[in-house]
Amino acid sequence: MAKLTKKNFIDSLREMSLLEVKELVDGLKEEFGIDPNALFVSGSNQDNNKIQVEEKTEFSVIVKDFGDSSNKIPIIKTVKEITGFGLYDIQKLLNTPDAVIQEKISKEKAEEIKNKLELIGAVVEIQ
């Protein structure tokens, strides 16, 4: 008997009817003990094992609310200290919803800035 090549096998499949292909697949499942559901589950488990969680290394400090206007001077001083911005830019920040104070900084630096701003009454989020 001649060796069955992949090309010959595919050519033979092309000549089969749909019913014959289904019978072939069922025969292969029975002969080799293949459970289609088990293949699907194990394939997804392999994908899950390959996925690695990347730890975030850069953070942004976002001020949701600067607090009362009675704290305006401490807020301006603190934001100036953190950003180095001038008065005009700080005023624009104070009037901006979800103002980004710092971007692409370490988690430790973001926590430090958050604590400074929360001490003066601001609502801060780290992303």
UniProtKB/Swiss-Prot annotation:
InterPro entries assigned to the protein according to its UniProt record, in alphabetical order: Ribosomal_bL12, Ribosomal_bL12_C, Ribosomal_bL12_C/ClpS-like, Ribosomal_bL12_oligo, Ribosomal_bL12_oligo_N_sf
SUPFAM superfamilies, A to Z: ClpS-like, Ribosomal protein L7/12, oligomerisation (N-terminal) domain
GO cellular component: cytosolic large ribosomal subunit
The entry's keywords: Ribonucleoprotein, Ribosomal protein
A molecular function GO annotation: structural constituent of ribosome
GO biological process terms held by the UniProt record: translation
Any one Pfam family match given in the protein's UniProt record, by short name: Ribosomal_L12
Its biological purpose: Forms part of the ribosomal stalk which helps the ribosome interact with GTP-bound translation factors. Is thus essential for accurate translation.
Quaternary data: Homodimer. Part of the ribosomal stalk of the 50S ribosomal subunit. Forms a multimeric L10(L12)X complex, where L10 forms an elongated spine to which 2 to 4 L12 dimers bind in a sequential fashion. Binds GTP-bound translation factors.
Family as reported in the entry's similarity comment: Belongs to the bacterial ribosomal protein bL12 family.
Annotated protein name in UniProt: Large ribosomal subunit protein bL12
Organism for this UniProt entry: Phytoplasma mali (strain AT)
